[in-house]
Amino acid sequence: MDNVRVRIAPSPTGYLHVGTAHTALFNWLFARHNKGTFILRIEDTDLARSTKEYEENIIEGLKWLGLYWDEGPYYQTQRLDLYRKYADELLKKGLAYYCYCTPEELEERRKEALAQKKPPRYDRKCLYLSDEERARYEREGRKPAIRLLVPEGKTVFNDIIRGEIEFNNEDIGDFVIMKSDGIPTYNFAVVIDDYTMGITHVIRGEDHISNTPKQLFIYNAFGWTPPEFAHLPLLLGPDRSKLSKRHGVTSVTEYKKMGYLPQALVNYLALLGWTPEENREIYTVEELIELFDLRRVTKNPGIFDVTKLEWINTQHIRRLSLEELADLTYPFLKEAEWFKEENFNKEYYLKVLSLLQERLKTLAQIKEYADYFFVDDLDYDVETVKKVCKHPDTPLYLEKIKDVWSQLSEFTAENLEASLKKLAEENQIPTKNLVHPIRVALTNKTVGPGLYEIAEVLGKEKTLKRLEKFIQFLKTL
């Protein structure tokens, strides 16, 4: 496909939503697959709600996901003269007209139409104003909006994903393209931008289907060839309603803070509404680019399932090298304030991660799993200790294993296991009667990685100290 040009055009009226990220990703994959151009356009004409903070969040979120753009960002507020120029052109052609109706008048006529069971479209009152009436409105200080003259008949377009879609023009009515304050409406600005930026494919959510006929009227009024349209399925919550905050986290920034990998979120979002030919679920970004095909996008909505995202994140964490995992988890580890930065031992941390990597579902979980590798003063839970130390001779056996382990010249998992099993055999006790209490002694947890591997990473000195402390704790019960 030659000279593909697509865009993502967020409004900076909120933080980057996973739905916007989903649309951005599909545009980006389409551009990269076809060696085309991906453009970022900031639609900031909602002056009351647009903020710099939201804009920066959107830009940083796209960068974090790796969705870098080739052109932009372009800003609609910097193009107001351009929109006015094209609106004036339509006025001159007689394809648009000034509308002096006030919001109150429009609302009254809308209610009247609904009461008469008619569609509440504009009644073209201002299309037929005399020069004298216009002059009177001007003297009253009314500032006119500009409406497009909608042609009669039907509007049909072919959607790449949904096939042929048809609209009755009379159901739409003449709509405003420039507001009375000189700001263009969404549909007008979008068409001018897409045309002047040479957009070849408009790939967006299905909630924009109803905007398409209005945009086609504008293309036709100028005699321009419209781009191809592809309307993606929306993301829904597990209850099949539109994804919103009540379903949990919806902002890309929050997923970053929770310790999700960008490549995992990209992998997951790509599979919402698109089915690759290959029957698997874990993909690299490079594989997604190679396989992406708009024709395999479904009409069915994508159900955003955090449990599935978590599973995909787990798989991507397991693919990381220990060095990569160390770099990515370190900011979360630092938040726990278990050590002074100048005392941080990278080599030791890599050993810790070799035990925890398989257990991490998110990067942030390092704070949940790694505490006992950095905190020596474990606060044992009495009920847990009583549960795992039911045998009255547990303190005695722990003293014995402490003595045995203190004499090991090589403090390896293999030697630790062999010596413990030998002691258990000699004393005719199940190994679990030693393993479970020792695990609690070393970690203050009842589950975790292999006990002997934990002891090896902690090292001889820490292991023996914790055993001694635990033995003394048992004597107080």
UniProtKB/Swiss-Prot annotation:
GO BP field: glutamyl-tRNA aminoacylation
Single GO cellular component term: cytosol
Enzyme Commission code(s) on record: 6.1.1.17
Record keywords, A-Z: Aminoacyl-tRNA synthetase, ATP-binding, Cytoplasm, Ligase, Nucleotide-binding, Protein biosynthesis
Superkingdom field: Bacteria
Broad class of enzyme this protein falls into: ligase
Short motif 'HIGH' region, span: 10-20
Motif placement: 'KMSKS' region: 242-246
GO MF term (any one): tRNA binding
InterPro entries referenced in this protein's UniProt entry, alphabetically: aa-tRNA-synth_I_cd-bd, aa-tRNA-synth_I_codon-bd_sub2, aa-tRNA-synth_I_CS, aa_tRNA-synth_I_cd-bd_sf, Glu-tRNA-ligase_bac/mito, Glu-tRNA-synth_I_codon-bd_sub1, Glu/Gln-tRNA-synth, Glu/Gln-tRNA-synth_Ib_cat-dom
Subunit structure: Monomer.
Similarity field: Belongs to the class-I aminoacyl-tRNA synthetase family. Glutamate--tRNA ligase type 1 subfamily.
Protein name: Glutamate--tRNA ligase
Gene source species: Dictyoglomus thermophilum (strain ATCC 35947 / DSM 3960 / H-6-12)
Gene that encodes it: gltX
